[in-house]
Protein backbone atom coordinates (compact mmCIF):
# COMPACT_ATOMS: atom_id res chain seq x y z
CA UNK A 1 0.00 0.00 0.00
CA UNK A 2 1.38 3.39 -0.92
CA UNK A 3 1.69 6.16 1.59
CA UNK A 4 -0.14 9.40 0.81
CA UNK A 5 1.92 11.64 3.09
CA UNK A 6 5.32 10.23 4.15
CA UNK A 7 6.27 13.38 6.09
CA UNK A 8 3.11 13.15 8.22
CA UNK A 9 3.90 9.46 8.84
CA UNK A 10 7.45 10.43 9.90
CA UNK A 11 6.15 13.06 12.33
CA UNK A 12 3.46 10.72 13.70
CA UNK A 13 5.97 7.94 14.37
CA UNK A 14 8.25 10.44 16.16
CA UNK A 15 5.32 11.78 18.21
CA UNK A 16 4.15 8.28 19.19
CA UNK A 17 7.64 7.05 20.13
CA UNK A 18 8.22 10.24 22.12
CA UNK A 19 4.91 9.81 23.98
CA UNK A 20 5.79 6.20 24.83
CA UNK A 21 9.30 7.25 26.01
CA UNK A 22 11.08 5.05 23.47
CA UNK A 23 14.82 5.61 23.13
CA UNK A 24 14.80 5.24 19.36
CA UNK A 25 12.40 4.83 16.46
CA UNK A 26 12.88 3.16 13.07
CA UNK A 27 11.39 4.81 9.98
CA UNK A 28 11.48 4.25 6.23
CA UNK A 29 14.36 6.30 4.80
CA UNK A 30 14.08 9.15 2.32
CA UNK A 31 16.22 12.22 1.67
CA UNK A 32 13.63 14.67 2.94
CA UNK A 33 13.13 12.69 6.17
CA UNK A 34 16.90 12.62 6.71
CA UNK A 35 17.00 16.40 6.16
CA UNK A 36 14.18 16.93 8.67
CA UNK A 37 16.03 14.70 11.15
CA UNK A 38 19.19 16.79 10.60
CA UNK A 39 17.26 19.98 11.40
CA UNK A 40 15.78 18.36 14.53
CA UNK A 41 19.27 17.31 15.63
CA UNK A 42 20.75 20.78 14.99
CA UNK A 43 17.92 22.40 16.96
CA UNK A 44 18.39 19.96 19.88
CA UNK A 45 15.11 18.04 19.62
CA UNK A 46 16.72 14.62 18.97
CA UNK A 47 20.09 13.30 20.07
CA UNK A 48 21.17 11.59 16.83
CA UNK A 49 20.09 9.66 13.74
CA UNK A 50 21.65 7.24 11.28
CA UNK A 51 20.66 5.06 8.33
CA UNK A 52 20.71 1.28 8.19
CA UNK A 53 20.42 -0.95 5.14
CA UNK A 54 17.58 -3.40 5.60
CA UNK A 55 16.56 -6.30 3.37
CA UNK A 56 13.83 -4.26 1.69
CA UNK A 57 15.41 -0.78 1.65
CA UNK A 58 17.01 1.71 3.98
CA UNK A 59 15.77 2.58 7.44
CA UNK A 60 16.27 5.82 9.30
CA UNK A 61 16.96 5.23 12.99
CA UNK A 62 16.26 8.30 15.14
CA UNK A 63 17.47 8.45 18.75
CA UNK A 64 15.10 10.54 20.84
CA UNK A 65 16.32 12.97 23.46
CA UNK A 66 15.03 13.30 27.01
CA UNK A 67 16.01 15.50 29.94
CA UNK A 68 17.67 14.32 33.16
CA UNK A 69 14.35 13.34 34.74
CA UNK A 70 12.96 11.89 31.46
CA UNK A 71 11.13 15.06 30.39
CA UNK A 72 10.56 15.16 26.64
CA UNK A 73 12.61 17.42 24.38
CA UNK A 74 9.80 17.44 21.81
CA UNK A 75 6.63 18.88 23.34
CA UNK A 76 4.71 18.83 20.07
CA UNK A 77 4.89 18.23 16.31
CA UNK A 78 2.39 19.45 13.75
CA UNK A 79 2.21 18.91 10.00
CA UNK A 80 1.24 22.21 8.34
CA UNK A 81 1.33 21.80 4.56
CA UNK A 82 -0.52 18.67 3.50
CA UNK A 83 -1.04 17.05 0.09
CA UNK A 84 -4.63 18.31 0.00
CA UNK A 85 -3.82 21.84 1.18
CA UNK A 86 -0.36 23.23 0.56
CA UNK A 87 0.76 26.14 2.75
CA UNK A 88 3.38 28.59 1.49
CA UNK A 89 5.00 31.56 3.20
CA UNK A 90 6.83 34.53 1.72
CA UNK A 91 10.18 35.58 3.14
CA UNK A 92 8.46 38.64 4.64
CA UNK A 93 5.70 36.59 6.29
CA UNK A 94 7.45 33.52 7.75
CA UNK A 95 5.64 31.82 10.66
CA UNK A 96 6.96 31.97 14.22
CA UNK A 97 6.23 28.98 16.42
CA UNK A 98 5.38 29.86 20.04
CA UNK A 99 6.87 33.33 19.65
CA UNK A 100 10.23 31.96 18.52
CA UNK A 101 10.54 29.14 21.07
CA UNK A 102 9.62 26.49 18.50
CA UNK A 103 10.83 25.84 14.96
CA UNK A 104 9.04 25.92 11.63
CA UNK A 105 10.57 23.62 8.99
CA UNK A 106 10.35 25.21 5.56
CA UNK A 107 11.13 23.68 2.17
CA UNK A 108 12.86 26.37 0.10
CA UNK A 109 14.82 26.56 -3.12
CA UNK A 110 17.92 26.40 -0.88
CA UNK A 111 16.78 23.12 0.69
CA UNK A 112 15.08 22.52 4.02
CA UNK A 113 15.59 25.40 6.44
CA UNK A 114 14.25 26.54 9.79
CA UNK A 115 12.18 29.70 9.95
CA UNK A 116 15.17 31.64 11.34
CA UNK A 117 17.53 30.42 8.61
CA UNK A 118 14.98 31.25 5.89
CA UNK A 119 14.48 34.75 7.30
CA UNK A 120 18.25 35.29 7.44
CA UNK A 121 18.63 34.19 3.81
CA UNK A 122 15.51 36.07 2.72
CA UNK A 123 13.75 33.09 1.14
CA UNK A 124 10.25 31.70 1.52
CA UNK A 125 8.77 28.33 0.67
CA UNK A 126 6.42 25.56 1.70
CA UNK A 127 5.84 25.32 5.47
CA UNK A 128 6.20 21.59 6.19
CA UNK A 129 5.90 21.35 9.97
CA UNK A 130 6.02 23.06 13.35
CA UNK A 131 8.10 21.60 16.20
CA UNK A 132 8.06 22.87 19.76
UniProtKB/Swiss-Prot annotation:
The keyword RNA-binding applies. One of its GO terms (cellular component) is ribonucleoprotein complex. Keywords: Ribonucleoprotein, Ribosomal protein, RNA-binding, rRNA-binding. It comes from the Bacteria. It holds the Pfam family Ribosomal_S8. One of its GO terms (molecular function) is rRNA binding. The keyword RNA-binding applies. GO terms for biological process: translation. Belongs to the universal ribosomal protein uS8 family. HAMAP family: Ribosomal_uS8_B. One of the primary rRNA binding proteins, it binds directly to 16S rRNA central domain where it helps coordinate assembly of the platform of the 30S subunit. Part of the 30S ribosomal subunit. Contacts proteins S5 and S12. NCBIfam families: PRK00136.1 (NF001109). This is Small ribosomal subunit protein uS8. It comes from Mycobacterium marinum (strain ATCC BAA-535 / M). The gene is rpsH.
Amino acid sequence: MTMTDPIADFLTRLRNANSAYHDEVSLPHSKIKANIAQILKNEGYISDFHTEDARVGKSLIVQLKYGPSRERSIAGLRRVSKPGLRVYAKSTNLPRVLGGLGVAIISTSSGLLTDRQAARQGVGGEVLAYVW
